[in-house]
Amino acid sequence: MQKPWVEKYRPQTLSEVVGHHEIIKRLTNYVEKKSMPHLLFSGSPGVGKTTAALALAKDLYGETWRENFLELNSSDERGIDVIRTKVKDFARTKPIGDAPFKVIFLDESDALTSDAQNALRRTMEKYSDICRFVLSCNYPSKIIPPIQSRCAIFRFSPLKTEDLVENLKEISEKENLTLEKGGIDAIIYVSEGDMRKAINVLQTAAAVSDTVTEEIVYKVASKARPDEIKKMTQLALNGKFVESREQLYNLMIDWGMSGEDILIQIFREVPNLDISEKEKVHLVEAIGECDFRIVEGSNERIQLSALLAKMGILE
């Protein structure tokens, strides 16, 4: 069975990692000196945190990286027992070969409970001579200050468009795909700097056709084209409520889009609308209120219809 492309084309060394040049430079220095502090990687999903941690381990240990590297996903194993058993058992044993220390990688560490984080802090202190911890998280504010203060913090930003484009073209060439300009632009739009999402969308589109077009990308990603969102929004702003609501229903039924997805796309379109700054402020406020109501469990169609109605009377 064919591997997912995100694994097939995952960088194996730090030099292969796409983007984040300053971060990679600092990590490479750690490898060269065979010395590093505990690390905290923060950033949104799909921007390279796990890839950087794996590449760091492979560069540090070479062929013995599996014996000296432990990866745990904290969202699955988030309790204090994991810290007391798996983490402590691995941390207390000496490194294999000539490695100066072992590395424990805790993915999604912001999912750890408060008790588990306090136990982790004590473990980090106790075994710091033979073990280093690399923590990754989406929300660093959920990591307790005592752990943050013990780590060198690396903030991974969403990948730049040129980095995404270069990688997508390289993968397309290896997979014998024709990647149209519109297809690239569509993948960039739906992925929002998330390389994992971009590669997954490309692979899904490739299963439909060897020529990746704009239409195919939006269809497999269950996203509306920006011009469709803009058309619906513009109709509402012009007071054509019934027509804009019809466009909304088409998106939800024909494209199978959730209300939350449509709302996010409307929000992304606000800066491009031909309305005053004051009206944009009121519109964003209305979008925020709509989002809150949907999250609380209100009917998506009713709330989005109400938002479109409000657009027609913006002041």
Curated annotation (Swiss-Prot):
Gene Ontology CC entries for this record: DNA replication factor C complex
GO terms, molecular function: ATP binding; ATP hydrolysis activity; DNA binding; DNA clamp loader activity
Family: Belongs to the activator 1 small subunits family. RfcS subfamily.
Sorted UniProt keywords: ATP-binding, DNA replication, Nucleotide-binding
GO terms (BP aspect): DNA repair; DNA-templated DNA replication
PANTHER family reported for this sequence: REPLICATION FACTOR C / DNA POLYMERASE III GAMMA-TAU SUBUNIT (PTHR11669), REPLICATION FACTOR C SUBUNIT 4 (PTHR11669:SF20)
Residues the entry annotates as binding ATP: G43, S44, P45, G46, V47, G48, K49, T50
This protein's record includes keyword Nucleotide-binding: yes
Name the record gives this protein: Replication factor C small subunit
InterPro entries: AAA+_ATPase (IPR003593), ATPase_AAA_core (IPR003959), DNA_pol3_clamp-load_cplx_C (IPR008921), DNA_Rep/Repair_Clamp_Loader (IPR050238), P-loop_NTPase (IPR027417), Rep_factor-C_ssu_arc (IPR023748), Rep_factorC_C (IPR013748), RFC_lid (IPR047854)
Function statement: Part of the RFC clamp loader complex which loads the PCNA sliding clamp onto DNA.
UniProt feature coiled coil, ranges: none
Pfam family of the protein (one): Rep_fac_C
Source taxonomy: Archaea, Methanobacteriati, Methanobacteriota, Methanomada group, Methanococci
Description of how the protein assembles with itself and partners: Heteromultimer composed of small subunits (RfcS) and large subunits (RfcL).
Family matches, as Gene3D superfamilies: 1.10.8.60, 1.20.272.10, P-loop containing nucleotide triphosphate hydrolases
Organism: Methanococcus maripaludis (strain C7 / ATCC BAA-1331)
Superkingdom assignment: Archaea
